[in-house]
């Protein structure tokens, strides 16, 4: 779970950089929007993005011509936040498990022998499934932001971030 937590921190940084590159609209990160849906991961992500973008000259506000950004930008708090919440749940379950007895049978302090099912892996299997889903969602939205970055039809940047295409293929295989 340590690597997953670090990945989520870096994902917020990548999300903020995407906002900068695309002159993202900052209103989707305003605190008022997130306090009315107080999911802890969502709140934390919105706060992180606000902090990372503080003082940026490369973001913008909504206008009549451009009311909102695509999901990959404006839903960063909801997507990253849900993954943060899932990973926090997994971390809690792992901490319980590594501090538990999973022997069978167990012998109490009083010498009483009890056969049971504490050896069963389901209490870890389900959280690890959640972990896989959480990381997959981060990968999915990250890939979509990369596509937006290298596709000149979706950004104001040259295709594959190459100024002079030809022999130089830039980020064609990202």
State each model region's role.
Residues 2-6, 26, 139-144:
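Short helix-capping/linker segments at secondary-structure and domain boundaries
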Residues 16-140:
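Accessory "access/gating" subregions that flank catalytic or transport cores
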Residues 9-12, 30-34, 144-155:
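Short alpha-helical "patches" and their helix-cap loops
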Residues 122-174:
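C-terminal catalytic subdomain
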Residues 7-10, 41, 170-174:
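Short acidic-hydrophobic sequence patches enriched in Asp/Glu that either
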Residues 1-22:
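Internal alpha/beta core interface subdomains
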């Amino acid at each position: 779970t340590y690597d997953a937590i670090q990945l989520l921190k870096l994902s917020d940084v990548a999300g903020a950089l995407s906002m900068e590159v695309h002159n993202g609209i900052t209103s989707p990160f305003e605190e008022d929007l997130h306090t009315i849906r107080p999911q802890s991961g969502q709140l934390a992500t919105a706060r992180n993005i606000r902090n990372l973008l503080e003082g940026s000259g490369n973001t913008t506000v909504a206008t009549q011509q451009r009311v909102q950004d695509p999901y990959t930008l404006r839903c960063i708090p909801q997507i990253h936040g849900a993954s943060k919440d899932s990973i926090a749940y997994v971390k809690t379950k792992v901490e319980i498990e590594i501090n538990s007895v999973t022997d069978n049978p167990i012998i109490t302090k009083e010498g009483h022998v009890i056969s049971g099912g504490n050896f069963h892996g389901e209490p870890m299997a389900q959280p690890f499934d959640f972990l896989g889903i959480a990381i997959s969602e981060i990968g999915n939205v990250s890939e979509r932001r990369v596509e937006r970055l290298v596709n000149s039809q979706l950004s104001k940047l040259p295709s594959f971030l190459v100024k002079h295409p030809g022999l130089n293929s830039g980020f064609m295989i990202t």
